[in-house]
């Protein structure tokens, strides 16, 4: 009983501390380009070209006045390919994730695009009980011992005839 009162008091104090401040507005989501993967590839190649142009223009400016600063420029040169490689690997990773090559990604894409076809379990299009609703096969409809239907194996269950 004491614990429930303590919890109620804690909730009341929490409400007073928050003082009804509204939550910050959610940030709008960035929309994907309308062209799908090809538009994204174009956008990535444009970004890579811009990065290469920026690196190319900063290269001669970073050289400086010459003299003894050669060691500093030699240390700066390996960092440019690393960043370029990192950007290229990130871009290729994005494109690899978007590419529907494998069976799993194609199946997932098909389920997303056509959810009505994949509503239930089981095979054969439709819900899970589509096989249950079908009738028995014609050869199973023949009468077995004592006029009872035979099961799928073709033997009578428990009657032994």
Curated annotation (Swiss-Prot):
Its main location: secreted. InterPro entries: Natr_peptide, Natr_peptide_CS. Snake venom natriuretic peptide that has a vasorelaxant activity in rat aortic strips and a diuretic potency in anesthetized rats. May act by activating natriuretic receptors (NPR1 and/or NPR2). Residues 19-135 are annotated as: Disordered. SMART domains: NAT_PEP. Residues 120-130 have a biased composition (Gly residues). Residues 94-104 have a biased composition (Basic and acidic residues). This is C-type natriuretic peptide. Keywords: Cleavage on pair of basic residues, Disulfide bond, Hypotensive agent, Secreted, Signal, Toxin, Vasoactive, Vasodilator. Residues 1-22 form the signal peptide. One of its GO terms (biological process) is vasodilation.
